[in-house]
Amino acid sequence: MTSPLPFVAVVPARLASTRLPNKPLADLGGKPMVVRVAERAREAGAQQVLVASDAQRVLDAVREHGFDAVLTRADHPSGTDRLAEVAAKLGFDDDTIVVNVQGDEPLIDPQLVRDVASHLAAHPSCAIATAAHPIHEAHEVFNPNYVKVVLDAHGVALYFSRAPIPWSRDAYLPHWPNVAAMPAPTCPVYRHIGLYAYRARFLRTYPTLAQAPIEAAEQLEQLRAMWHGERIAVRVTEHAPEAGIDTPADLERVQALFRSRAK
């Protein structure tokens, strides 16, 4: 599958996961997880797929399956910082679109990867593009692990938060603080999907930006870009993506899926 839009996909992969050690190398149907992710990025039509890791074992495994890999430093505080190092090392042109495909999402939809890259290309005033999908249940809106995003009339992010935003005042206040009794939201609420496309020129700038107070409070790195005046275009998709792999239970679920596909 090819794409009319040239973009680079980078898959950050680090072995030092506290909940699931050696996660990028976990076996999924005979291949390491990080390779499965790289395959999805290739299906999305990326002009180039790179795996970025601070572990030689990961680089070796990726290269054995025909993908390019870049050795990066071990001290990066975020995946965006790791992408910035890759962009600097490889000398990407300023306008190169670089998509960060999380290394623990082997079921990510290639179409969504392609759509986010195209969305950034269609919004020249934005440095970043990402994705979101609508949520409708109060328990989702009030879950701090579900990051919400509020959009302006042009689909550009106004704010990301773990809090329930926008706050449906007349619907929520009569029931506050009993979250279990909360009705469904009265206006659209969007849950953020952690897939990003960047312009390479922004990636070169990102490591020089000071951490923002709102970023530290929410623990959301995209708020740093917004704090410093960058715009983030949001591609809304109607469907929630497949869940990533964070725990041993997640891994067992996805391994079972790959086993069933092999039959």
UniProtKB/Swiss-Prot annotation:
Pfam families from the UniProt entry: CTP_transf_3
SS bonds (residue pairs): none
Pathway(s) annotated for this protein in UniProt: Nucleotide-sugar biosynthesis; CMP-3-deoxy-D-manno-octulosonate biosynthesis; CMP-3-deoxy-D-manno-octulosonate from 3-deoxy-D-manno-octulosonate and CTP: step 1/1; Bacterial outer membrane biogenesis; lipopolysaccharide biosynthesis
EC number(s) given by UniProt: 2.7.7.38
Catalytic reaction(s) noted: 3-deoxy-alpha-D-manno-oct-2-ulosonate + CTP = CMP-3-deoxy-beta-D-manno-octulosonate + diphosphate
Subcellular location: Cytoplasm
SUPFAM superfamilies listed in its UniProt record: Nucleotide-diphospho-sugar transferases
Matches recorded under InterPro entries: Cytidylyl_trans, KdsB, Nucleotide-diphossugar_trans
Keyword vocabulary terms for this entry: Cytoplasm, Lipopolysaccharide biosynthesis, Nucleotidyltransferase, Transferase
One function term, GO molecular function aspect: 3-deoxy-manno-octulosonate cytidylyltransferase activity
GO BP annotations listed: CMP-keto-3-deoxy-D-manno-octulosonic acid biosynthetic process; lipopolysaccharide biosynthetic process
A GO cellular component entry from the record: cytosol
Similarity annotation: Belongs to the KdsB family.
Function: Activates KDO (a required 8-carbon sugar) for incorporation into bacterial lipopolysaccharide in Gram-negative bacteria.
Protein name per its UniProtKB record: 3-deoxy-manno-octulosonate cytidylyltransferase
UniProt gene name: kdsB
